[in-house]
């Protein structure tokens, strides 16, 4: 600290984690304009009320987000790259029994529309089994595909697993 060397037996690294992104340019351009990573933070906003919404993911977090959004949305599409949810059985059963949640299996979001309008109007989907592409109209995209640890600054200095989590 201020040029002084401090010796210690333990260092606590509490840098947290950031939301994992899809990696799309349009996702970044439309963040906070319909692209979000937190249903409880943003789901009740007027721009999402009584509108079709999309959640991406297949784990417990995605299922929780989709279930929460049914309070506000006209319909919630749950996009998952596999043919079944990775969520716990109780969460998966709850989602699959909810008439306002429509799963779309074996698919990924390849683009978010419409950057020109400066708001989310649809997502472009690709079916991973057939290769077919389609557009799904929506007012919001809620991304729930996990987190990335904020540990890059320590790479090469401490032991981490392949995902960047401290061992």
What annotation goes with each model-predicted range?
Residues 49-51, 106:
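Phosphate-coordination loops involved in phosphoryl transfer and adenosine-cofactor binding
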Residues 62:
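N-terminal Rossmann-fold NAD(P) dinucleotide-binding loop
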Residues 57-59:
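Glycine-rich Rossmann-fold phosphate-binding loop(s) that bind the pyrophosphate
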């Amino acid at each position: 600290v201020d040029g002084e060397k401090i010796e210690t037996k333990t260092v606590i690294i509490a840098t947290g984690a950031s939301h994992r992104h899809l990696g799309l340019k349009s996702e970044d351009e439309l963040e906070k304009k319909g692209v979000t990573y937190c249903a409880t933070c943003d789901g009740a906003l007027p721009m999402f009320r009584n509108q079709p919404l999309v959640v991406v993911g297949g784990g417990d977090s995605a299922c929780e987000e989709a279930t929460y959004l049914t309070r506000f949305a006209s319909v919630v599409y749950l996009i998952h790259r596999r043919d079944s949810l990775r969520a716990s059985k109780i969460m998966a059963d709850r989602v699959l029994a909810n008439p306002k949640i429509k799963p779309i299996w074996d698919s990924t979001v390849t683009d978010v529309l419409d950057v020109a309008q400066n708001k989310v109007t649809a997502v472009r989907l690709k079916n991973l089994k057939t290769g077919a592409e389609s557009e799904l109209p929506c007012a919001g995209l809620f991304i729930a595909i996990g987190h990335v640890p904020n540990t890059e600054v320590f790479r090469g200095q401490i032991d981490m697993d392949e995902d960047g989590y401290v061992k």
